[in-house]
Curated annotation (Swiss-Prot):
A GO term, aspect molecular function: metal ion binding
GO BP terms: aerobic electron transport chain
Keyword set includes Transport: yes
Protein name: High-potential iron-sulfur protein
Subunit architecture: Homodimer.
Cellular component aspect of the GO annotation: periplasmic space
Family assignment from sequence similarity: Belongs to the high-potential iron-sulfur protein (HiPIP) family.
């Protein structure tokens, strides 16, 4: 089942967390999170993403919606393991 994609233009949570579908366009350096260098932080290696594969994946920060695998937000946290 395809979940609706998080829309950073209209989603208040996405705006608060500075979510971007393309991490290259996000200000990762200014909001640097521990675990990996900012340029290696993506939704696909974040603990909040709930799938191990797929271009669009469910995220626990956006219930019922999907984030892009190469996206990023200010809550990025390195996936354990």
């Amino acid at each position: 089942q395809d979940l609706p994609h998080v829309d950073p233009a209209t989603d208040p949570t996405a705006q608060a967390l500075k979510y971007s579908e393309d991490a290259a366009n996000a200000d990762r350096a200014a909001a640097a999170r521990p675990g990996k260098p900012p340029e290696e932080q993506f939704c696909h290696n974040c603990q909040f993403v709930l799938a191990d594969s797929g271009e669009w994946r469910p995220c626990s920060l956006f219930p019922g919606k999907a984030v892009h695998e190469t996206g990023w937000c200010a809550s990025w946290t390195l996936k354990a393991g």
